Structures are given as C-alpha cells and as structure tokens.
Amino acid sequence: GVMHGDLTTSNFILFKNIVYMIDFGLSQNTIKPEDHAVDLRLIKEILNSAHAKIMESSWKNFLLGYKSVVGIAYQTKIVKLVSEIESRGRYAQVV
C-alpha cells in the first residue's frame, strides 16, 4: 500500500462534500505495516495538538474511513501498532 509520508490535516481538502488526500510528494509504496502506523500516528498527533476540541470525533471518523479502504483486520493491526509506537520512549501518549 501507499504510505503518505506527511499525513496532516493540511493535506486533506473538502470538495463538494468529499474529502480528498493531497500532496503525495513524500509518499512511497510499502508493505511494512509499521510505515502505515507511522502515518496514522502523525495524523492522530496533529488532530490532538491542532484540533483538540474535535480530536476524538475526528479520529473516530478517520478510522471509519480508513477501515472502509483497508478492511477491519488491517485497520485493527495498524491501530495496535500505533499504540505500540506511542508507548516507545520518544513519543508522548496521545489520547
């Protein structure tokens, strides 16, 4: 699959009620689940820091959309890896 490489809210646009992901300049094809987890960890961190008031609902909706693309099994695996990444010493836990 594709790892975006800079998955921030600045790289999403809304056009005619459809959300599009843009700016794939840092993207790469990868089969490593951890690469995808790093992408999700970044968007989660951005939601928490820049959009704290809507973080929980935004994260929930993001994961629903993610699941619709990758399937429940892969989404579950990646979310677990996000938690593992957050537990590493250099990352602060995000709600």
What do these predicted regions represent?
Residues V2-T9, L14:
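Catalytic-loop of the protein kinase fold
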Residues N17:
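Conserved catalytic motifs of the protein kinase core domain
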Residues Y20, F24-V95:
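C-lobe/activation-segment region of protein kinase-like
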